[in-house]
A protein has these predicted regions:
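Sec-dependent N-terminal signal peptides
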Residues: 4-13
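N-terminal "domain-start" segment that seeds a small globular fold
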Residues: 17-38
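Amphipathic alpha-helical repeat scaffolds
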Residues: 29, 49-53
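Conserved helix-turn-beta segment immediately C-terminal to the redox Cys motif
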Residues: 38-44, 52-53, 57-81, 100-104
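Extracytoplasmic/secreted proteins, especially bacterial periplasmic and envelope-associated proteins
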Residues: 58, 62-65, 91, 95, ...
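Thiol-based oxidoreductase modules, predominantly thioredoxin-like and allied folds used
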Residues: 74-91, 107-118
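Thiol/selenol-based redox catalytic cores and closely related redox-interacting motifs
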Residues: 101, 105-155
Length: 155
């Protein structure tokens, strides 16, 4: 009984270790290195899943322009290629990064190719999909001020 109880406590403890906020995740960049999401604490994050062989691929140019304009103010665009939608992100992470660099001069962080749906979905994207929708931002915070300035320019 003591052994079973110990096992239960261990498993229960493991459940409490599940990420409760985005900064508890670790992801893999396009170079295959682990990156702690806590590195981005205090930044405004735009996390995108992308494909390099679809009708929306030219949006990389717009994402890069957004990054260039607001990176100094704390914007980080985190690009996670995904091949789950019509096999439109072929190649390795390194090949995808090379394509984006050569065609769109992308300089924002790019990460390993992942799945965003199903049983093989990356834990970060599973977490993101479980979150509530946008509820506004606090203009007293740097992130809120940046978002406010970006959205006002687009109105």
């Amino acid at each position: 009984m003591k052994r079973i109880l110990s096992c239960f406590v261990f498993l229960w403890g493991g459940l409490t270790l599940a990420a409760q906020e985005i900064y508890e995740f670790t992801v893999t960049n396009a170079d295959g290195k682990s990156v702690a999401m806590s590195n981005y604490r205090g930044k405004v994050l735009l996390i995108v899943n992308t494909a390099t062989r679809c009708g929306f691929t030219p949006q990389y140019k717009e994402l890069e322009a957004l990054y260039e304009q607001y990176a100094a103010q704390g914007l980080e665009i985190l690009d996670f290629p995904c091949n789950q939608f019509g096999q439109q992100a072929p190649g390795t992470a390194a090949e995808i990064r090379q394509f984006c660099s050569a065609n769109f001069d992308v300089r924002f962080p790019q990460f390993d190719k992942i799945d965003v749906n199903g049983p093989t979905a990356a834990p970060l994207f599973t977490y993101l999909k479980e979150q509530k929708g946008f509820a506004g931002f606090d203009l007293k915070e740097k992130a809120g001020q940046l978002l406010d300035s970006m959205l006002r320019k687009q109105d």
